[in-house]
Amino acid sequence: MRFEDIGISKVDKVCLVDRLGCQENLVGTVHVTTTHIIFRAENGSKELWLATGLISSVEKGTLTAAGCMLVIRCKHFQVITLLISRDKSCQDLYETLQRAAKPVSVNVTELLAFENREPVEDVRGWRRLDWNSEMTRQGITKSQWTESNINEGYTICDTYPNKLWFPTAASTSVLLGSCKFRSRGRLPVLTYFHQQTEAALCRCAQPLTGFSARCVEDEKLMELVGKANTNSDNLFLVDTRPRVNAMVNKVQGKGFEDERNYSNMRFHFFDIENIHVMRASQARLLDAVTKCRDVTEYWKTLEASGWLKHVRSVVECSLFLAESISRGTSCVVHCSDGWDRTSQVVALCQLLLDPYYRTIHGFQVLIEKDWLGFGHKFDDRCGHVGALNDEAGKEVSPIFTQWLDCIWQIMQQKPRAFQFNERYLIEMHEHVYSCQFGTFIGNCDKDRRDLNLSKRTKSLWTWMDARHDDYMNPFYSPTAHVALLDLDTRAARFTVWTAMYNRFDNGLQPRERLEDLTMAAMEHVGVLESHVAQLRTRLAELKTQQNQQITSTNTPTNMVDSGMSSATDDLKNLSLSHPLDPLSSTLPILERATSQESGVMDSSLYYPDEALTKYSLKWQPLRGADRCSNPACRGEFSSTIERRIHCHLCGMIFCRRCLKVSADERERVCDKCKTD
């Protein structure tokens, strides 16, 4: 948001209303900057920051005796309700927030990501995908598929990457002819090669057939795609649109392929609706999860939204593709322009087939390849910049959100197949819209290069790499699943993703997340086991020193044995005990034992109590931990998705800002423990 768009920069005596009535309302001040909306409570108990790019809509209520209500709905599904006593202040703030939600400027360089004042040296983040390395990893047979420089400099298709792979037998004239016959020049190209069956997954846009047009070069290219598979030359062409929609496009000179003109090809339609239907569907879904007050109304609104039906359609189409490729049949997929529904099903199909894409790093590579590389229009679909007219505003649609929802549905059935957890998906979704990073800015790869984003903005991947442990799934087993082809696609298996759509609705008794409880327990056990290992090491040192003293001083054996037996036996008992057993009863024994001896013990063998009591046996529970334990911070955890992190020494919960990682990256300690 530009400085001149700020009509009012500060509003006092604003009441932050808890719409669920679970917490007390807070009086404070609202500050408006070019990048954030900030609410700070007068008593200092709460400070809420909201990036202006996350504002979706603003609603102003009627003036009452108490004041005027202002409801801010966000793209990451937070709902903020403000009660402002003065109507003039409310109107000024409303108009300011409206300009943030619907920016007048169409200049993408005014986004938050470009406000970065630090020098950008983010090579790893901006080079997450290396096309040649990825195709080599897939095991492409160069005798059948080859890299082409036909789109070098984005000359034939500006929404495709400049590196493309085609059947080796395809000539340049065939490629150019097919390019002219496909919408937006998006001809069939390889995106995934299944090494076990040599089946290929290709993507493209709809053909410009109209009612009778055909293209010999396009037909030849499709034939070569089928023949590139030495195990089967059959080819499935999957149109993700409803058949009636494809028929309507014929009137516009577009449409779908005539099966009679393509040899060895079978046609399949899948009824995945367009961006306008999905936008309306999500709006009804949000009405159900945020506005409905009784169960009957909730279920009626949810059913009317059709959201779960649409999610199911995407999963079913992706599963069909995965099953076909695993059986050895190559597939070509398109929708209208090949950057919305095609990106959804092609990427989800690869996720089902290849366990690499179900890792944290591999998932980022998949997004870079099939969403960013092949031109999903993130600027338009996410509404990053203002629209020149109302028609351009209708380009906004939750296509990427829906794809993440599909992945979450699969995670519920296969919880051990994914290295990452749902926090990974939710935080990624937030930053797709926040525009804090440059990764998801631009409509295609060419846009991002023209904007020089790698030099001017930071990569989301680097930011997430620094929080890698936040996204680990404690139940992940790399060998548990290879291909996920046994999904249950019955309607009852698809449910509302409440952690996403009700992320900020904590309620009276917010539940701890099972993943977080498990991770905290595993981390605690790991810390204690590490401490036990240190004690065992110290025990070995004591034994070594004992033997050295025997040799050097020629002390009678019975005196040494009597002097050391008490200490070493206690350490043995301690090292063999369970890491979670209380150690308080055994901790003082070493000091007592050594102090009672008659001068035989060397001072270097003394092992003080503070070394044994370094780690807390009892950690602060996650339940009720809604604030950082640092008295100077007391930062609030606004939702259960925000990770509560334990100090390895005192066991208290802190926010990430108040914890420091040791030099060897083995310990995480708070400022107080670090000082002590």
From Swiss-Prot:
| Family matches, as InterPro entries | Myotubularin (IPR030564), Myotubularin-like_Pase_dom (IPR010569), PH-like_dom_sf (IPR011993), Prot-tyrosine_phosphatase-like (IPR029021), Tyr_Pase_AS (IPR016130), Tyr_Pase_cat (IPR003595), Znf_FYVE (IPR000306), Znf_FYVE_PHD (IPR011011)
PANTHER family, per database record: MYOTUBULARIN-RELATED (PTHR10807), PHOSPHATIDYLINOSITOL-3-PHOSPHATE PHOSPHATASE (PTHR10807:SF8)
Q: Name one GO biological process term.
A: nematode larval development
State the tissue distribution. Answer: Expressed in intestinal cells. Expressed in head neurons, pre-anal ganglion, hypodermal cells, anal depressor muscle and non-neuronal cells in the tail.
Organismal lineage: Eukaryota, Metazoa, Ecdysozoa, Nematoda, Chromadorea
Name the record gives this protein: Phosphatidylinositol-3,5-bisphosphate 3-phosphatase MTMR6
Its record classes its membrane topology as:
Peripheral membrane protein
SUBUNIT field: Heterodimer with mtm-9.
**Which amino acid positions bind substrate, per UniProt?**
N249, K250, V251, Q252, N274, I275, C335, S336, D337, G338, W339, D340, R341, R381
Instruction: Fetch the Gene3D superfamilies from UniProt.
Output: Pleckstrin-homology domain (PH domain)/Phosphotyrosine-binding domain (PTB) (2.30.29.30), Zinc/RING finger domain, C3HC4 (zinc finger) (3.30.40.10)
Q: Where are zinc fingers of the kind FYVE-type found along the chain?
A: 618-675
Q: Which residues are recorded as binding a 1,2-diacyl-sn-glycero-3-phospho-(1D-myo-inositol-3-phosphate)?
A: N249, N274, I275, S336, D337, G338, W339, D340, R341, R381
- Domain-level remarks: The FYVE domain appears to be dispensable for membrane targeting and activity but may be important to increase avidity to membrane.
Name of the gene encoding the protein in the UniProt record: mtm-6
- Active site: which residues? C335 (phosphocysteine intermediate)
Group of enzyme by EC: hydrolase
Disulphide bridges: none
> What family does the database annotate?
Belongs to the protein-tyrosine phosphatase family. Non-receptor class myotubularin subfamily.
User: Which superkingdom is the protein from?
Assistant: Eukaryota
Q: What is the organism field in this record?
A: Caenorhabditis elegans
Q: Print the keywords alphabetically.
A: Cell membrane, Cytoplasm, Endocytosis, Hydrolase, Lipid metabolism, Membrane, Metal-binding, Zinc, Zinc-finger
- The chain positions of domain Myotubularin phosphatase read 125-501
- Its EC number(s): 3.1.3.95
Location(s) in or outside the cell:
Cytoplasm; Membrane; Apical cell membrane
Protein purpose: In association with mtm-9, plays a role in endosome trafficking probably by regulating phosphatidylinositol-3-phosphate levels. Regulates fluid phase endocytosis in coelomocytes. Controls the endosomal localization of sorting nexin snx-3 and the levels of sorting receptor mig-14.
GO MF terms here are: phosphatase binding; phosphatidylinositol-3,5-bisphosphate 3-phosphatase activity; phosphatidylinositol-3,5-bisphosphate phosphatase activity; phosphatidylinositol-3-phosphate phosphatase activity; zinc ion binding
- A single GO cellular-component term on record: plasma membrane
Residue positions annotated to bind a 1,2-diacyl-sn-glycero-3-phospho-(1D-myo-inositol-3,5-bisphosphate) are N249, N274, I275, S336, D337, G338, W339, D340, R341, K377, R381
Entry keyword annotation includes Thylakoid: no
